């Protein structure tokens, strides 16, 4: 089974926030951890706290082309942004965009016309766009309808917030957006949204089942956001899906754990078989 993590962060600077461990998480460290967990490859989402993270992502994908690909970010309000979008796929390992509008100076992009020029260019490029967060998701329905050939990926279960008592708060329309064939969902970061739970995080199982019923296994992508998981090992994040969800068929698991993502992003890594995973 090809196992591709739909989201990790790699960085070599020291700007990381506490919930990501603060110290750098390098490509070499990730490869060793992936081998131990039985993970073949991963999509790196360069962290926005590090202004130089796209550079490190390109370097990492160049050194390990069968282990890492990248959904990079860019400042859409810069004059050079349209040309960068047009040339995005020419960068080694760059297979998509990730737009969250999380910074204060980005929050107007969905309504000030910025996304109106970006999305047609992204659609023309053929590269998927990962969208997430409370400033972006309210506009997904409009964008999915306006740009039927744009592959949209919802970040982290379609999350718009998180609280200690409610855990994961999804956008209320996440399930209904499944009617758009160009919308998919990353099942990433789950254990971090179940901090009061423990492996196998049964509080998440019903959410996963509802997304499965809505989207099917062809539009769901397993992932971890591993540097944020303090209550779960990488191997446990794998086995939660491969061993603890009995309603998934073997074909479902093959799709959700990597095959569906490979098709959606048109990325076919061919890594050597990872080392045998350690017991969880």
Residue positions per predicted region:
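Catalytic metal-binding/acid-base residues of hydrolase active sites
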Residues: 9, 48, 158, 190-191, ...
